[in-house]
């Protein structure tokens, strides 16, 4: 691991550990950075970031590869956009379609990463034909699968922690939900909302739009890979390298 990566990891871990402390103190009532429900989301997101950052060198060790600093920078930027800006600064709720933009951007990056992984291992084994087509398909489905797991992640914490990551609770009813997740507003208000087309589709709309954005982002990612890496194959070596090549270069 290069010194640049070590510094980046340390800064990220300190940042999200600090954010976690702020979220815990807010949840306990000692500070008031967010409301009670938002502090839970920030806690979950901060813990996920802390674990996720540590998983990057673990994946490198298991697969015996080295991601370029470009990959780590992309991860750092994504975490800033989603956690620090999106959740901690409430940009998700202030900027329309901000969540959809991040889904599109995330799957685009995962498609490029999946493509690069496939090309790397195919190049290492030097087996098989039509490697470009296979790698493009792998990149597409790799990105969609990662984002599908993200939806499972959101659903799991919504169910276990009472958060609203999947936006299944309408904004106008957020203040009417108790600690057990039950509505405290009148039955007439609830019935009036869910009797409409918007109401009985509401619970799945956010997730389905996320999946659509994921698919579009992944498709865009493999198109970019096909256009750029087809004519500049040397760029593939800038994303993933084997441990042996890195050591030899050093």
Model-found features: residue ranges?
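N-terminal membrane topogenic signal
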Residues: 1-17
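Membrane-interface helix-boundary motifs at transmembrane edges
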Residues: 2-5, 34-38, 57-70, 124-130
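Membrane-interface helix caps and helix-loop-helix hairpins in membrane proteins
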Residues: 32-37, 62-65, 88-98
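Alpha-helical transmembrane segments of multi-pass membrane proteins
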Residues: 53-57, 78-83, 143-154
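Cytoplasmic-side transmembrane-helix entry/capping segments in multi-pass membrane proteins
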Residues: 66-77, 100-103
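Membrane-proximal helix-loop-helix units in multi-pass membrane proteins
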Residues: 85-140, 155-162
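Alpha-helical transmembrane segments that form the membrane-embedded catalytic/substrate-binding core
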Residues: 103-110, 138, 142-185, 201-226
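Conserved small/polar residues in nucleotide/adenosyl-binding loops
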Residues: 244-250
